[in-house]
Amino acid sequence: MENTVVIKCGGSVLDELSPAFFASVKTMREQGMNVVIVHGGGPEIGKMLKQLNVRSEFVNGLRKTTKEVLAVVEMVLSGKVNKQLVTMFKQHGLPAVGISGVDGGLLEAEPIDGIKLGYVGRVTAVRVDLLQTLLAANYIPVISPLGVGRSGQTYNINADTAAGAIAAAIGANQLAFVTNVPGLLQDGTLIGEATAETVEQLLKDGVITGGMIPKVKAALSALSDALPKVMIVSGKTPFYEQGTWHGTTIRKEVGAYL
């Protein structure tokens, strides 16, 4: 879909989204863009698991998802975080509809590794027609990253990779990862623009660390001929003003422009 932007909001930044974030989304819509939101919820899931005394562990950066963990993930992502985010959009005058990847079979999924990761899935198909229906009705879809297998089994999907899969499926011309920092930083200084090759080297050199690693890897994997650039932006300050993006632009290659 032309003029479509997929924005992924990490769970750690949801409580810090400023009025400037919503103003940026509003600006996009005023300029005729379709906006799709995908959100995480890791911190809230972690809190609830602790409260309910449900054991959880991470394997290669992904939360191993047993049946007990999956029940909590569903409850927190779709029941709490999704509705809170939809309410925030409404408070800023933006029409949003909360939807899980399970609803309407929006995100079809399969297990990545049932033995090591349990019910953690990868997206295999996206119901593009469902998103098109919501966008045509002038809504902002706010998607919690759960998927459903062909047998009806629900899967926990990493929000970064879900956003990339959705962007590719609907033919978005922009994908942005919203964080609590201005973008990629090197020695405290914002990297305004970098090629995929440069970013891969920064990963190898240990310049990119912690929670930024999965976001950057998802950004790199989302790059394609159809989506030659991806943004990493802040949710605390305006990230889009008067047609200009603020943050780090990762390009597939030198000179790759939309």
Swiss-Prot record:
The keyword Nucleotide-binding applies. Keywords: Amino-acid biosynthesis, Arginine biosynthesis, ATP-binding, Cytoplasm, Kinase, Nucleotide-binding, Transferase. It catalyses: N-acetyl-L-glutamate + ATP = N-acetyl-L-glutamyl 5-phosphate + ADP. It holds the Pfam family AA_kinase. Its EC number is 2.7.2.8. GO terms for cellular component: cytoplasm. Pathway: Amino-acid biosynthesis; L-arginine biosynthesis; N(2)-acetyl-L-ornithine from L-glutamate: step 2/4. Substrate binds at G41, G42, R63, N156. The lineage of its organism: Bacteria, Bacillati, Bacillota, Bacilli, Bacillales. The record marks K8, K215 as: Transition state stabilizer. Its main location: cytoplasm. One of its GO terms (biological process) is L-arginine biosynthetic process. Belongs to the acetylglutamate kinase family. ArgB subfamily. GO terms for molecular function: acetylglutamate kinase activity; ATP binding. It is found in: Cytoplasm. Disulfide bonds: none annotated. This is Acetylglutamate kinase. Catalyzes the ATP-dependent phosphorylation of N-acetyl-L-glutamate.
